Amino acid sequence: MRLNARDLRALWDLPRLRAAACGYFGHMWELYAFWAVVPALCLTIAASPANPAPALWSGWLAATVIGAGALGCIVGGYLARRMGSARVACAALGGSGLICLVYPLLPESMSGLRLAALLLWGVLVVADSPQFSALSAQAAPPQLLGLALVLQNGIGFLISVISIVLLSALMDFWGARALWLLAPGPLLGLWAMRGQLGRSRPCFNKED
């Protein structure tokens, strides 16, 4: 497949595809950077005088937080069949963005609350991913579908590399407050999707 400016312009000129792709980019700014620092966040929770093996427990906690995303994807898929992918994607993106803003404000002494917030964050942070992919697949013309998804995923992972590097560096200086670096992703993603909620339909209905 040849990449040419005409195809790129044709894809960018599709409002629904542009909104879904930009929403996905905001999601990718947050997702992998969050996963990258989950072990460090869990180690802070597990580190206490009463815990003789904080490293071991933090590993189990981190795996649980990241694995909780599977539940988010399953529930998100179920809800998308009734509410539409755009609504589910925006709800998950907004929820994870809200936790991103609130989590650094939680006292370190409230380890149970912090763990609950991380688990909920783990559920929400990835639940929008398949929905954005579905929205893009529905919006792209068949002859450019492969190109649209390749570009969306490639740009998304490039964005992830940047956010991972920045967040990992800032965590050493700011601790949990560095998580605020992730907030622009969900916020910009929601802004990009602002005109799509009214058009969201259940997935079992044929799109226009």
Regions found by a protein language model. Name each.
Residues 137-174:
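A late C-terminal transmembrane helix in Major Facilitator Superfamily
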Residues 84-135:
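C-terminal transmembrane helical hairpin of 12-TM major facilitator-type secondary transporters
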Residues 16-70, 74:
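Extracytoplasmic gate region of multi-pass secondary transporters
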Residues 1-22:
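Juxtamembrane intracellular "pre-TM" segments in multi-pass secondary transporters
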Residues 104-107, 176-208:
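Multi-pass alpha-helical transporter architecture, strongest
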Residues 72-85, 171-172:
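Helix-to-loop junctions at the C-terminal end of transmembrane segments
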Residues 52-55, 167-186:
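A membrane-interface helix-boundary motif in multi-pass transporters
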